[in-house]
C-alpha cells in the first residue's frame, strides 16, 4: 500500500507548551509540509520535514475526525488532537490558503461530508488585463445617455394638468365686505382738553378780547372825551363813570372782570381801574386849585354846548347816565372851562394806556407760558 501527497506548503512549525503557555518553535528554518493519503486504509497524515533532510521529521500527525483546525490569522493556522497542539506560520498567504483549504476538505471527508476541491487557485494574478477592458465600457455609457435625452419631452404633458386648477380664483370675491372697520379712531382728540383748566381758557379769551376790542374802544372814548371836557360836564361825568356803567361807549373794560373764568383777569382789571381812579383824583385836585382864581372865562364857551348836545343825542343810553351824574359833578364845572385840563387828561390817558398794555402783555405772556407748560405736562 502506498501513500500519495495531496498538497504541500512551506512554513515554520510551532508547538504549544502548557507550562509556559507560549508557542515554541520546533526549528529555526521553514519546514516542508505535506498531506499524504493512503488509498488502501483510507487514512490521512501530515508530515513536516525540517530543511532538506528527509529524515528530520518535525510533524508526523495522523488526521482523524476529532482533529480541530482553526485559522488564527491569514498566515498562522493551528490544529490539535487533544494531546498536541501544532501551529504553522506560513511563508505566504497562498501557501496558507492551499494548506488550510486542503486540511479542511480532509476533515470534511472523514466526517462523512462531501469533499470540496481545495481553493488552490482562487486568486489568480492575471487580474491586471481586465483593467484595460474598462475603457471600452465607456462608449456604451455614452450611447445610453443619448436615449435619455428624448425622455425630456415627456414632462410637457404634465403642464396641462396644472391648467385645470385655474378655476379656483373665483372664490376670492366674498372678501370685500371687510373694509368698514376704520371709522372708530376719531374719538382720540379728547386728551388735549385735560392739559389746561377751563379757567385759564376763559382768562385767555377775556384778555384777548380786552386787548383787541377793549383797547380800541377806549381809544375812541379818549378821543371823544377831549371834546366834552372843554364844553359840557356831562361828558366828563360819563367818562368818570365808564368803569361802572356797562351801556356807555367807553365802558368796555368793565365787563372783562365779569366774563373772565379765573381770578387773574378780574384782579388785573381791578388794579388798572384803581390806578386810573387814583390818577384822575390826583389830576382833578390841581385843576380845581388852578381854576379857582380864574372864574371869569366861564361865560366864553357858553355857545359850545349846542354842538355837543347834538352830537350825543343819537345814543340815548349815553345821555341817561349823564343826567344821573350831572348833579354829583356840578362843583368841578369851573375846571372844565380851562384849556389846560384837556392836555393833562390826554397825557394821563396816554400813560394809562401804556400801563394797561404792558400789564395785559405781561398777563398774556404768563398765560401763554402756563398753557405751554400744561400742554407739555399732558404730553408726558
Swiss-Prot record:
Residues 349-378 are annotated as: 2 X 15 AA tandem repeats of [LI]-Q-[SK]-[AL]-K-[DE]-E-I-L-[ET]-[AE]-[IV]-[KR]-[ES]. Belongs to the Ena/VASP family. Residues 199-218 form the WH2 domain. The EVH2 domain is comprised of 3 regions. Block A is a thymosin-like domain required for G-actin binding and actin polymerization. Block B is required for F-actin binding and subcellular location, and Block C for self-association. Residues 348-380 are annotated as: EVH2 block C. Residues 1-110 form the WH1 domain. The lineage of its organism: Eukaryota, Amoebozoa, Evosea, Eumycetozoa, Dictyostelia. Residues 263-280 are annotated as: EVH2 block B. Residues 115-139, 166-192, 294-306 have a biased composition (Pro residues). Residues 350-380 form a coiled coil. One of its GO terms (molecular function) is SH3 domain binding. Gene3D superfamilies: Pleckstrin-homology domain (PH domain)/Phosphotyrosine-binding domain (PTB), Vasodilator-stimulated phosphoprotein. Its main location: cytoplasm. This is Protein VASP homolog. It is found in: Cytoplasm, Cell cortex; Cell projection, Filopodium; Cytoplasm, Cytoskeleton. Residues 229-380 are annotated as: EVH2. Residues 233-259, 307-342 have a biased composition (Low complexity). Keywords: Actin-binding, Cell adhesion, Cell projection, Chemotaxis, Coiled coil, Cytoplasm, Cytoskeleton, Repeat. The gene is vasp. InterPro entries: PH-like_dom_sf (IPR011993), VASP/EVL (IPR017354), VASP_sf (IPR038023), VASP_tetra (IPR014885), WH1/EVH1_dom (IPR000697), WH2_dom (IPR003124). Residues 94-346 are annotated as: Disordered. One of its GO terms (biological process) is actin filament polymerization. GO terms for cellular component: cell cortex; cell leading edge; cytoskeleton; cytosol; filopodium; filopodium tip; macropinosome; phagocytic cup lip.
Amino acid at each position: 500500500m502506498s501513500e500519495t501527497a495531496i498538497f504541500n506548503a512551506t512554513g515554520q512549525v510551532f508547538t504549544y507548551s502548557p507550562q509556559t503557555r507560549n508557542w515554541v518553535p520546533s526549528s529555526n528554518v521553514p519546514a516542508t509540509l505535506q498531506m499524504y493519503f493512503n488509498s488502501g486504509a483510507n487514512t490521512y497524515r501530515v508530515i513536516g520535514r525540517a530543511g532538506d533532510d528527509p529524515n528530520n521529521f518535525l510533524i508526523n500527525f495522523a488526521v482523524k475526525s476529532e482533529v480541530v483546525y482553526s485559522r488564527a490569522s491569514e498566515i498562522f493556522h493551528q490544529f490539535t488532537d487533544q494531546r498536541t497542539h501544532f501551529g504553522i506560520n506560513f511563508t505566504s498567504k497562498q501557501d496558507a490558503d492551499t494548506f488550510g483549504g486542503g486540511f479542511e476538505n480532509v476533515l470534511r471527508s472523514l466526517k462523512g461530508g462531501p469533499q470540496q476541491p481545495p481553493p488552490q487557485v482562487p486568486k489568480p494574478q492575471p487580474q491586471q488585463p481586465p483593467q484595460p477592458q474598462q475603457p471600452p465600457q465607456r462608449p456604451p455609457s455614452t450611447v445610453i445617455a443619448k436615449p435619455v435625452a428624448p425622455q425630456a419631452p415627456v414632462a410637457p404633458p404634465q403642464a396641462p394638468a396644472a391648467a385645470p386648477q385655474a378655476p379656483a380664483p373665483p372664490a376670492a370675491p366674498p372678501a370685500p365686505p371687510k373694509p368698514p372697520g376704520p371709522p372708530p379712531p376719531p374719538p382720540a382728540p379728547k386728551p388735549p382738553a385735560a392739559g389746561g383748566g377751563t379757567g385759564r381758557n376763559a382768562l385767555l379769551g377775556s384778555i384777548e378780547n380786552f386787548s383787541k376790542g377793549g383797547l380800541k374802544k377806549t381809544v375812541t372814548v379818549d378821543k371823544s372825551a377831549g371834546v366834552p371836557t372843554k364844553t359840557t360836564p356831562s361828558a366828563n361825568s360819563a367818562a368818570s363813570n365808564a368803569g361802572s356803567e356797562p351801556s356807555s361807549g367807553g365802558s368796555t373794560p368793565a365787563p372783562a372782570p365779569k366774563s373772565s373764568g379765573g381770578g387773574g383777569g378780574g384782579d388785573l382789571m381791578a388794579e388798572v381801574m384803581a390806578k386810573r381812579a387814583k390818577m384822575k383824583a390826583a389830576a382833578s385836585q390841581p385843576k380845581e386849585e388852578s381854576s379857582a382864581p380864574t372864574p371869569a372865562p366861564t361865560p366864553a364857551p357858553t355857545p359850545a354846548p349846542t354842538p355837543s348836545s347834538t352830537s350825543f343825542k343819537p345814543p340815548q343810553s349815553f345821555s341817561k347816565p349823564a343826567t344821573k351824574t350831572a348833579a354829583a359833578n356840578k362843583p368841578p364845572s369851573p375846571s372844565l372851562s380851562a384849556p389846560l385840563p384837556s392836555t393833562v387828561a390826554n397825557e394821563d390817558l396816554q400813560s394809562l394806556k401804556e400801563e394797561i398794555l404792558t400789564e395785559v402783555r405781561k398777563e398774556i405772556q404768563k398765560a401763554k407760558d402756563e398753557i405751554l407748560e400744561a400742554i407739555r405736562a399732558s404730553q408726558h
